[in-house]
């Protein structure tokens, strides 16, 4: 029996954003080190807050909005040819693609620590620049270029 009183668990983030932050933590996590991934995210949000002069979660929300794709192309075989058919993305896949692209872009950056790289990518994505936003723009351009094949949707 413990002699000390049990402490209540504290919520780290607002409930609405906790799903988003949890997804980012899972994408950041390597070798099961969830505590380290959470610390990286917390530090990145603090750095982003300092550089953008806006609350960290607001920066994260804006960055995700700018990096999240709405439409993508999927290959569809018709006759002997394969066409890239533009398809609208479901909400959950949209979110996971945005998070994945942000984390991948942050990992590719050159910098000191992962929290610095992630903070830089978040601020860039919030401002509409950066690798994750560029990837979204490329995806949308590809869908726009293949709009003629949209009648092949299944």
Q: Where are each of the predicted segments found?
A:
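Strongly charged
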Residues: 1-31, 35-38, 42-154
């Amino acid at each position: 029996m413990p002699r000390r009183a049990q402490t209540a668990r504290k919520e780290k983030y607002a409930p609405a954003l906790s799903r988003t932050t949890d997804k980012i933590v899972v994408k950041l996590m390597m070798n099961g080190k969830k505590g380290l991934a959470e610390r990286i995210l917390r530090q990145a949000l603090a750095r982003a807050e300092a550089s953008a002069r806006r609350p960290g979660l607001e920066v994260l929300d804006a960055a995700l909005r700018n990096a999240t794709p709405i439409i993508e192309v999927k290959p569809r075989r018709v006759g002997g040819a394969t066409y890239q058919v533009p398809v609208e993305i479901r909400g959950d896949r949209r979110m996971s693609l945005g998070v994945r692209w942000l984390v991948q872009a942050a990992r590719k950056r050159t910098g000191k620590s992962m929290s610095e790289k992630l903070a830089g990518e978040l601020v860039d994505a919030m401002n509409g620049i950066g690798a994750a936003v560029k990837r979204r723009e490329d995806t949308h351009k590809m869908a726009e270029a293949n709009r003629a094949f949209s009648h092949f949707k299944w």
